[in-house]
């Protein structure tokens, strides 16, 4: 089995290296990841300057670009074969609810999917038990060998930050939602220039039973199928009726 791994925390992050160690038990692992932390990069591509790469070891490539750049480069240039799966992670922290819109980890999996390779994103809801998340991924990848992912779907997996033996199982979930994050943190640099930091994410808003938030609170692994098609299919008819009315004015 051939596995491509990427992330948004950077090639030297603990999560991706723990993941690579465990998945290497299943086959050949190649890491192509950002040269530094690119959290929050979403699906951005680098278009205003060329990408530079560096070989960090055997089958380990760092890229001075976004997670999407990394997977795009790996699949379209670096690898001379198609991997069996793209695994993005292990993210340092949750990707729950609308986090997925900003997540570079989810974006790396999305790019793999765009380019025709089955893909999953894995996040640890914390920063301690990366071994737990890695074992969860290993189990899922083994099962994917026997039964592939549903067509046109990406799996977004969030693992509670607890020892593997304490997990209560898994739950297929929908995305929950957070309250809007409105806080900005104002600061002043040593030269007296004003600067701003983005504040913390909003608190949970939609986090009831059936959501990814609820699952991890119950010490369950949350597995959320995602799709790339952003069309609001249930709104097509109503928007067409609205446009017909607008067109008469």
Swiss-Prot record:
Per the entry, which co-factors are needed?
Answer: a divalent metal cation
Cellular localization per UniProt: Cytoplasm
Q: What is this protein called?
A: 5'-nucleotidase SurE
Q: Which family does it belong to?
A: Belongs to the SurE nucleotidase family.
Role played: Nucleotidase that shows phosphatase activity on nucleoside 5'-monophosphates.
Under which EC number(s) is this enzyme classified? Answer: 3.1.3.5
Q: What is its main location?
A: cytoplasm
Catalysed reaction(s) here are: a ribonucleoside 5'-phosphate + H2O = a ribonucleoside + phosphate
């Amino acid at each position: 089995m051939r596995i491509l791994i990427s992330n948004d925390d950077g090639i030297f992050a603990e999560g991706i290296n723990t993941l690579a160690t465990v998945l290497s038990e299943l086959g050949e692992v190649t890491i192509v990841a950002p040269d530094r932390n690119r959290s929050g990069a979403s699906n951005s591509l680098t278009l205003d300057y060329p990408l530079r790469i560096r070989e960090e070891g055997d089958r380990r490539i760092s890229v001075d670009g976004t997670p999407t750049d990394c997977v795009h480069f790996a699949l379209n240039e670096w690898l001379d074969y198609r991997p069996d799966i793209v695994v993005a992670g292990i993210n340092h922290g949750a990707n729950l609810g609308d986090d997925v819109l900003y997540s570079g980890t989810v974006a790396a999996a999305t790019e793999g999917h765009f380019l025709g390779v089955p893909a999953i994103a894995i996040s640890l809801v914390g920063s301690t038990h990366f071994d737990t998340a890695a074992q969860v991924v290993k189990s899922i990848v083994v099962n994917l060998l026997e039964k592939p992912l549903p067509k046109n779907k990406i799996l977004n997996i969030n693992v509670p930050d607890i020892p593997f033996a304490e997990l209560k199982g898994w739950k297929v979930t929908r995305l929950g939602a957070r309250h809007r994050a409105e806080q900005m943190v104002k600061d002043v640099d040593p030269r007296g220039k004003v600067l701003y930091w983005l504040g913390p994410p909003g608190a949970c808003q939609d986090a009831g039973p059936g959501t990814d938030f609820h699952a991890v609170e119950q010490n369950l692994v949350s597995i959320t199928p995602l799709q790339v098609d952003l069309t609001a299919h249930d709104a097509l008819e109503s928007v067409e009726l609205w446009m017909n009315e607008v067109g008469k004015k």
